[in-house]
Amino acid sequence: IDDASLNQIVDNIQSRLEELGKEKGVTFDVSYDNCNADASVMEQIISDFQADKVDLMVGVATPVAMRMQSATEESDTPVVFSAVSDPVGSGLVDSLDAPGANITGTSDYLDTSSIMKLIQAQNPDVKKIGLLYDVGQDSSTTAIQEAKDYLDKEGIEYVERTGTTTDEVQLAADALIADGVDAVFTPTDNTIMTAELSIYEKFIDAGIPHYTGADSFALNGAFVGYGVDYANLGQKTADMIADILIDNADPSKTAVETFDNGTATVNTETCKALGLDFDTVKKAFEPLCTQVNEITTAESFDEVESK
Protein backbone atom coordinates (compact mmCIF):
# COMPACT_ATOMS: atom_id res chain seq x y z
CA ILE A 1 0.00 0.00 0.00
CA ASP A 2 1.24 3.47 -0.81
CA ASP A 3 1.13 5.25 2.54
CA ALA A 4 3.54 7.50 4.38
CA SER A 5 4.56 5.04 7.13
CA LEU A 6 5.20 2.09 4.82
CA ASN A 7 7.05 4.28 2.33
CA GLN A 8 9.21 5.56 5.18
CA ILE A 9 10.01 1.97 6.18
CA VAL A 10 10.98 0.98 2.62
CA ASP A 11 13.14 4.09 2.19
CA ASN A 12 15.00 3.35 5.42
CA ILE A 13 15.47 -0.33 4.59
CA GLN A 14 17.05 0.60 1.27
CA SER A 15 19.24 3.41 2.63
CA ARG A 16 20.46 1.25 5.52
CA LEU A 17 21.27 -1.65 3.16
CA GLU A 18 23.35 0.73 1.04
CA GLU A 19 25.17 1.83 4.19
CA LEU A 20 25.74 -1.76 5.36
CA GLY A 21 26.91 -2.76 1.89
CA LYS A 22 29.64 -0.14 1.97
CA GLU A 23 30.65 -1.18 5.49
CA LYS A 24 30.84 -4.88 4.64
CA GLY A 25 32.10 -4.62 1.07
CA VAL A 26 29.04 -6.21 -0.53
CA THR A 27 26.31 -5.05 -2.88
CA PHE A 28 22.65 -5.72 -2.13
CA ASP A 29 20.65 -6.11 -5.35
CA VAL A 30 17.19 -4.95 -4.28
CA SER A 31 14.04 -5.49 -6.35
CA TYR A 32 11.13 -3.40 -5.08
CA ASP A 33 7.46 -3.52 -6.02
CA ASN A 34 4.15 -2.34 -4.55
CA CYS A 35 0.90 -4.27 -4.97
CA ASN A 36 -1.24 -1.36 -3.67
CA ALA A 37 -3.48 -3.76 -1.72
CA ASP A 38 -4.38 -5.75 -4.84
CA ALA A 39 -4.19 -9.46 -3.93
CA SER A 40 -3.77 -10.65 -7.52
CA VAL A 41 -0.95 -8.18 -8.12
CA MET A 42 0.69 -9.29 -4.86
CA GLU A 43 0.56 -12.93 -6.02
CA GLN A 44 2.23 -11.99 -9.30
CA ILE A 45 4.95 -9.97 -7.61
CA ILE A 46 5.80 -12.84 -5.25
CA SER A 47 5.77 -15.32 -8.16
CA ASP A 48 8.15 -13.04 -10.05
CA PHE A 49 10.48 -12.88 -7.05
CA GLN A 50 10.48 -16.67 -6.88
CA ALA A 51 11.14 -16.98 -10.61
CA ASP A 52 14.08 -14.60 -10.19
CA LYS A 53 15.38 -16.91 -7.43
CA VAL A 54 15.84 -14.12 -4.90
CA ASP A 55 17.93 -14.95 -1.83
CA LEU A 56 15.45 -13.40 0.60
CA MET A 57 12.01 -11.79 0.56
CA VAL A 58 10.95 -8.78 2.61
CA GLY A 59 7.26 -8.31 3.35
CA VAL A 60 6.21 -4.88 4.61
CA ALA A 61 2.93 -5.09 6.58
CA THR A 62 0.98 -8.16 7.66
CA PRO A 63 -0.90 -9.21 4.48
CA VAL A 64 2.26 -9.29 2.35
CA ALA A 65 4.28 -11.08 5.02
CA MET A 66 1.61 -13.76 5.42
CA ARG A 67 1.46 -14.43 1.69
CA MET A 68 5.24 -14.56 1.41
CA GLN A 69 5.38 -17.03 4.27
CA SER A 70 2.91 -19.40 2.63
CA ALA A 71 4.60 -19.03 -0.77
CA THR A 72 8.02 -20.01 0.59
CA GLU A 73 7.02 -22.88 2.90
CA GLU A 74 8.36 -25.50 0.49
CA SER A 75 11.59 -23.62 -0.24
CA ASP A 76 14.70 -22.43 1.57
CA THR A 77 13.99 -18.76 0.87
CA PRO A 78 13.95 -16.81 4.13
CA VAL A 79 11.36 -14.10 4.74
CA VAL A 80 11.90 -10.97 6.81
CA PHE A 81 8.74 -9.07 7.68
CA SER A 82 8.49 -5.44 8.69
CA ALA A 83 5.78 -3.55 10.58
CA VAL A 84 3.68 -6.57 11.56
CA SER A 85 1.64 -5.61 14.61
CA ASP A 86 0.90 -9.11 15.92
CA PRO A 87 3.33 -11.70 14.49
CA VAL A 88 2.15 -14.46 16.84
CA GLY A 89 -1.57 -13.79 16.47
CA SER A 90 -1.30 -13.65 12.69
CA GLY A 91 0.41 -17.05 12.67
CA LEU A 92 3.70 -15.84 11.23
CA VAL A 93 5.82 -17.03 14.16
CA ASP A 94 5.50 -19.46 17.06
CA SER A 95 6.81 -16.88 19.51
CA LEU A 96 8.63 -13.56 19.42
CA ASP A 97 11.79 -15.08 20.89
CA ALA A 98 11.86 -18.18 18.66
CA PRO A 99 9.95 -17.78 15.37
CA GLY A 100 10.29 -21.49 14.63
CA ALA A 101 10.30 -21.27 10.82
CA ASN A 102 12.28 -19.60 8.06
CA ILE A 103 10.86 -16.19 8.96
CA THR A 104 11.51 -13.34 11.38
CA GLY A 105 11.32 -9.56 11.32
CA THR A 106 10.23 -6.38 13.07
CA SER A 107 6.96 -5.66 14.86
CA ASP A 108 5.18 -2.34 15.31
CA TYR A 109 3.04 -3.64 18.17
CA LEU A 110 0.84 -0.83 19.48
CA ASP A 111 0.34 -0.13 23.20
CA THR A 112 -3.37 0.64 22.88
CA SER A 113 -3.97 1.46 26.53
CA SER A 114 -1.43 4.28 26.32
CA ILE A 115 -3.40 5.94 23.51
CA MET A 116 -6.59 5.62 25.56
CA LYS A 117 -4.78 7.38 28.40
CA LEU A 118 -3.77 10.19 26.04
CA ILE A 119 -7.43 10.67 25.13
CA GLN A 120 -8.36 10.86 28.80
CA ALA A 121 -5.47 13.21 29.57
CA GLN A 122 -6.59 15.65 26.89
CA ASN A 123 -10.28 15.31 27.78
CA PRO A 124 -10.92 13.94 31.28
CA ASP A 125 -14.68 14.17 30.62
CA VAL A 126 -14.65 11.93 27.54
CA LYS A 127 -17.80 9.80 27.48
CA LYS A 128 -17.96 8.17 24.03
CA ILE A 129 -15.12 7.07 21.76
CA GLY A 130 -15.41 6.00 18.14
CA LEU A 131 -13.37 3.03 16.92
CA LEU A 132 -12.57 3.41 13.22
CA TYR A 133 -10.85 0.53 11.43
CA ASP A 134 -10.95 -2.05 8.65
CA VAL A 135 -12.38 -5.30 9.99
CA GLY A 136 -10.32 -7.18 7.40
CA GLN A 137 -6.99 -5.83 8.65
CA ASP A 138 -5.26 -8.37 10.89
CA SER A 139 -3.12 -5.56 12.29
CA SER A 140 -6.23 -3.93 13.78
CA THR A 141 -7.90 -6.94 15.42
CA THR A 142 -5.86 -7.15 18.61
CA ALA A 143 -5.61 -3.38 19.12
CA ILE A 144 -9.36 -2.85 18.76
CA GLN A 145 -10.11 -5.63 21.24
CA GLU A 146 -7.61 -4.14 23.68
CA ALA A 147 -9.30 -0.75 23.27
CA LYS A 148 -12.71 -2.28 24.01
CA ASP A 149 -11.38 -4.06 27.09
CA TYR A 150 -9.81 -0.85 28.39
CA LEU A 151 -12.90 1.26 27.75
CA ASP A 152 -15.15 -1.36 29.38
CA LYS A 153 -13.02 -1.18 32.54
CA GLU A 154 -13.13 2.62 32.48
CA GLY A 155 -16.88 2.70 31.92
CA ILE A 156 -16.52 4.68 28.70
CA GLU A 157 -18.99 4.06 25.89
CA TYR A 158 -17.65 3.19 22.44
CA VAL A 159 -19.08 2.73 18.97
CA GLU A 160 -17.45 0.85 16.10
CA ARG A 161 -17.48 1.88 12.46
CA THR A 162 -15.54 0.07 9.76
CA GLY A 163 -14.62 0.42 6.11
CA THR A 164 -12.62 -1.57 3.57
CA THR A 165 -12.29 1.15 0.92
CA THR A 166 -11.72 4.90 1.05
CA ASP A 167 -15.36 5.53 0.14
CA GLU A 168 -16.53 3.24 2.95
CA VAL A 169 -14.13 4.89 5.40
CA GLN A 170 -15.55 8.30 4.51
CA LEU A 171 -19.05 7.00 5.24
CA ALA A 172 -17.82 5.47 8.50
CA ALA A 173 -16.33 8.82 9.52
CA ASP A 174 -19.63 10.55 8.77
CA ALA A 175 -21.42 7.94 10.89
CA LEU A 176 -19.09 8.49 13.85
CA ILE A 177 -19.73 12.22 13.66
CA ALA A 178 -23.48 11.53 13.65
CA ASP A 179 -22.96 9.19 16.62
CA GLY A 180 -21.70 12.16 18.64
CA VAL A 181 -18.38 10.66 19.70
CA ASP A 182 -15.95 12.78 21.72
CA ALA A 183 -12.85 11.28 20.07
CA VAL A 184 -11.94 8.65 17.48
CA PHE A 185 -9.28 5.93 17.76
CA THR A 186 -7.67 4.07 14.86
CA PRO A 187 -4.80 1.56 15.31
CA THR A 188 -2.04 0.89 12.75
CA ASP A 189 -4.63 0.24 10.05
CA ASN A 190 -3.39 0.64 6.47
CA THR A 191 -6.88 1.08 5.01
CA ILE A 192 -7.68 4.03 7.27
CA MET A 193 -4.17 5.40 6.75
CA THR A 194 -4.75 5.45 3.00
CA ALA A 195 -8.02 7.34 3.53
CA GLU A 196 -6.80 9.79 6.19
CA LEU A 197 -6.31 12.73 3.83
CA SER A 198 -9.96 12.40 2.80
CA ILE A 199 -11.42 12.27 6.33
CA TYR A 200 -9.31 14.44 8.62
CA GLU A 201 -11.16 17.64 7.72
CA LYS A 202 -14.49 15.97 8.52
CA PHE A 203 -13.31 15.34 12.07
CA ILE A 204 -11.85 18.84 12.39
CA ASP A 205 -15.12 20.43 11.24
CA ALA A 206 -16.98 18.32 13.82
CA GLY A 207 -14.52 19.22 16.58
CA ILE A 208 -13.50 15.57 17.06
CA PRO A 209 -9.82 14.70 17.66
CA HIS A 210 -8.59 11.60 15.82
CA TYR A 211 -6.04 9.53 17.78
CA THR A 212 -4.07 7.01 15.73
CA GLY A 213 -1.37 4.36 15.89
CA ALA A 214 1.32 5.94 13.70
CA ASP A 215 2.88 9.33 13.06
CA SER A 216 1.95 9.07 9.37
CA PHE A 217 -1.71 9.57 10.30
CA ALA A 218 -0.78 12.86 11.98
CA LEU A 219 1.23 13.78 8.90
CA ASN A 220 -1.94 13.31 6.86
CA GLY A 221 -4.09 15.42 9.18
CA ALA A 222 -5.05 13.34 12.22
CA PHE A 223 -4.75 15.08 15.60
CA VAL A 224 -2.29 12.58 17.12
CA GLY A 225 -0.17 9.69 15.92
CA TYR A 226 1.35 7.51 18.65
CA GLY A 227 3.61 4.50 18.44
CA VAL A 228 7.00 3.37 17.20
CA ASP A 229 9.64 5.21 15.16
CA TYR A 230 9.15 3.79 11.65
CA ALA A 231 12.45 5.14 10.35
CA ASN A 232 14.26 3.20 13.07
CA LEU A 233 12.07 0.14 12.42
CA GLY A 234 13.09 0.18 8.75
CA GLN A 235 16.77 0.42 9.65
CA LYS A 236 16.50 -2.48 12.11
CA THR A 237 14.74 -4.54 9.43
CA ALA A 238 17.73 -3.94 7.14
CA ASP A 239 20.10 -5.04 9.91
CA MET A 240 18.20 -8.34 10.19
CA ILE A 241 18.33 -8.81 6.42
CA ALA A 242 22.11 -8.32 6.46
CA ASP A 243 22.55 -10.68 9.42
CA ILE A 244 20.76 -13.44 7.51
CA LEU A 245 22.36 -12.90 4.10
CA ILE A 246 25.91 -12.08 5.20
CA ASP A 247 26.34 -13.63 8.64
CA ASN A 248 24.10 -16.66 8.02
CA ALA A 249 21.81 -15.95 10.96
CA ASP A 250 19.02 -18.53 11.26
CA PRO A 251 15.62 -16.79 10.93
CA SER A 252 13.90 -19.52 12.95
CA LYS A 253 16.15 -18.69 15.91
CA THR A 254 16.34 -14.92 15.40
CA ALA A 255 14.02 -13.11 17.79
CA VAL A 256 11.45 -10.74 16.37
CA GLU A 257 12.57 -7.16 16.97
CA THR A 258 10.12 -5.07 18.97
CA PHE A 259 10.25 -1.38 19.79
CA ASP A 260 9.22 0.90 22.61
CA ASN A 261 6.05 2.89 22.03
CA GLY A 262 5.91 6.33 23.51
CA THR A 263 6.35 8.95 20.81
CA ALA A 264 3.28 11.14 20.35
CA THR A 265 3.22 13.22 17.17
CA VAL A 266 0.74 16.10 17.26
CA ASN A 267 -0.43 17.84 14.10
CA THR A 268 -0.23 21.47 15.21
CA GLU A 269 -2.47 22.71 12.38
CA THR A 270 -5.19 20.25 13.33
CA CYS A 271 -4.66 21.02 17.01
CA LYS A 272 -5.29 24.72 16.37
CA ALA A 273 -8.27 24.00 14.10
CA LEU A 274 -9.82 21.95 16.91
CA GLY A 275 -9.52 24.96 19.20
CA LEU A 276 -6.82 23.34 21.32
CA ASP A 277 -3.61 24.92 22.56
CA PHE A 278 -0.55 22.87 21.63
CA ASP A 279 1.43 23.79 24.76
CA THR A 280 -1.48 22.68 26.94
CA VAL A 281 -1.83 19.42 24.99
CA LYS A 282 1.91 18.79 25.21
CA LYS A 283 1.87 19.35 28.97
CA ALA A 284 -0.98 16.84 29.35
CA PHE A 285 0.76 14.26 27.14
CA GLU A 286 4.34 14.52 28.43
CA PRO A 287 3.90 12.38 31.59
CA LEU A 288 2.58 9.57 29.36
CA CYS A 289 5.13 9.79 26.53
CA THR A 290 8.86 9.49 25.96
CA GLN A 291 8.57 12.50 23.67
CA VAL A 292 5.97 14.75 22.06
CA ASN A 293 6.71 15.84 18.50
CA GLU A 294 5.10 18.42 16.24
CA ILE A 295 4.15 18.00 12.59
CA THR A 296 2.09 19.80 9.96
CA THR A 297 -0.16 18.32 7.30
CA ALA A 298 1.47 16.91 4.16
CA GLU A 299 1.19 13.87 1.91
CA SER A 300 4.66 12.51 2.63
CA PHE A 301 7.51 12.90 5.11
CA ASP A 302 9.70 14.10 2.24
CA GLU A 303 7.46 17.15 1.89
CA VAL A 304 7.85 17.95 5.58
CA GLU A 305 11.63 17.54 5.45
CA SER A 306 11.89 19.79 2.41
CA LYS A 307 9.97 22.67 4.03
PLM segments and residue spans:
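Short beta-strand segments enriched in small/hydrophobic residues
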Residues: 1-6, 127-134, 184
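Beta-alpha junction/loop-to-helix N-cap segments that form part of ligand/metal-binding clefts
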Residues: 31-94, 189-204, 208-213
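Hydrophobic alpha-helical segments within soluble ligand-binding/sensing domains
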Residues: 86-128, 228-249
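Hinge/cleft segment of the Venus flytrap/periplasmic-binding protein
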Residues: 243-307
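Pocket-lining segment of extracytoplasmic ligand-binding domains
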Residues: 138-210, 214
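Short beta-strand elements in bilobed, periplasmic/extracellular small-molecule ligand-binding domains
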Residues: 19-42, 102-103, 148-166
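An alpha-beta-alpha
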Residues: 13, 104-154, 254-270
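Extracytoplasmic "Venus flytrap"
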Residues: 1-20, 31-40, 136-140, 189-194
